[in-house]
Structures are given as C-alpha cells and as structure tokens.
Amino acid sequence: MRTVKVSSGRVEEYENGSLRRTFGSNIVSAATDGQTTVAVTSSGRVEEYVNGSLRRTYGSNARSAQVSGDTVAVQTANGRTEEYVNGSLRRTY
C-alpha cells in the first residue's frame, strides 16, 4: 500500500510504512491511488508522477487534486472542479 505526504515542498512516497522515494519541488498538496501520484505546485499547476517520474503537467489555479485511475479531479481557486482524463480537460463543474 502506497501513501504520500508533502514535506518541505517535496512529495514523500511511503510503501508499507517505509519511505520509498521523494520527488518534486514547490509542492503544496499531493494524492495517490497507489499507482499514479498527482501533486499541486505552489504556482497552481498539477503534476502527474508514475514511480517518481514526471509524466505530465497541466491546469492552472489548482488548490488540491484527487486521482483515480486515469481520471484526475482538480479543485481550483475559484471553487470549481475540473476533471482531467489522460491530461485532457473533460469537464468543469
């Protein structure tokens, strides 16, 4: 089971309670589904990581994000939610 937390602006990934790796910079929040990790930077961009490697970045004005499979839900600064599938904006609500 993988979990993530943000410490000193970097994502720390834990596996079975042990620190596995750290990655990213200027990170304010992060979430994982066990496979993919999404992180929100201080500039409001969403970064998507797989096994600690950056896959893609997208969005703007992000405050927090959640991930499930290939779908990422991003809460923006203006209170809206943007849904991305494979890095492409699907809908906003």
Give residue ranges: language-model regions.
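An edge-strand/N-cap motif at the start of beta-rich repeat modules
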Residues: 1-19
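Short beta-strand elements that form the blades of beta-propeller/WD-repeat-like
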Residues: 1-6, 35-41, 70-76
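Loop/turn residues immediately N-terminal
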Residues: 8-11, 43-46, 78-81
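A short beta-strand motif characteristic of beta-propeller blades
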Residues: 17-24, 52-59, 89-93
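Repeated scaffold domains used in trafficking and secretory/extracellular systems
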Residues: 24-36, 59-71
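Extended, compositionally simple hydrophobic/Ser/Thr-rich segments
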Residues: 37, 46-47, 72, 81
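Blade-level signature of beta-propeller repeat domains, shared across WD40, Kelch, NHL, RCC1
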Residues: 78-93
